[in-house]
């Protein structure tokens, strides 16, 4: 499951019994400081990325949920590993792990990833996967999209299973990826 830290922060705030009142107090404080526009928006908890991505490796698919104009949407996409070019001579440390560089073209962009061989999980943020270690950092050529791990911990939580999610997805409108993206970027 992949989702934004800010989404987690906002959802956690709203999970409190008085979460909406706390949110209102953050907004009132920011307005009181004279913040406007982007500064005001960044001063209060809000979602920056509305999509949540569920990777179903056994079925080879990705389920994406997203929110647009008051409606929740769900679409499925193929879980395809990118065709990575691993550069064995390029190394860098990310979060205390020595990482190796890999590059690929994916959905019209050139991407650079740094993956940790000492974390043998072939996964990463968003739809990125297929390297022989956890993708710790990935970005496109212009760094318009940039994802970097900021922490890692092992938890003993109940695994995410799609059987449980099916009932949660009942209020989502099913759509295909292309139609969703056309609606989103219209």
Region roles according to the model:
Residues 94-95, 106:
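Structural motif
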Residues 1-83, 89-91, 98, 143-186:
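Extracellular or lumenal secretory-pathway regions
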Residues 87-94, 123-125:
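Short helix-to-loop capping/linker segments positioned immediately adjacent to catalytic or ligand/cofactor-binding
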Residues 100-165:
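Gly/Pro-enriched, hydrophobic low-complexity segments
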